[in-house]
């Protein structure tokens, strides 16, 4: 995570230097072109998701299997080959981390709030217990009080 932050800070500094040079040189047309192109690139997003996925799964290595236990057998969610998590799993990974607001999730996943809402609703419809599904997801990986007491 720290490595990722450092890399983005370095990119931001490079961009800031470039903008400073363009402003001093009066190259405002070039700056306007940069603002149209300087959006998050596909490779930046892919790298971000790979780092997020790997970090999250280090914290919660059994997340996918525990998550799927909350879904009907015919509705299991499995990432594609080469993926650690997919969009649905990332949404619920964020929920597990305490981020429940769809707008915040949308910002973090580069999606619209409506897309987040649609995914959440679709996955909730596949749950064994729809009413407590998100509460159960939020508890994935927690030690129960009973387990703690038995190990004491």
Model-derived regions: residue spans:
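Phosphate/oxyanion-binding loops and surfaces in catalytic or ligand/nucleic-acid-binding neighborhoods
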Residues: 7, 18, 59
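Conserved HAMP-HisKA connector
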Residues: 1-6, 13
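Histidine phosphotransfer helical core of two-component systems
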Residues: 13-53, 74-79
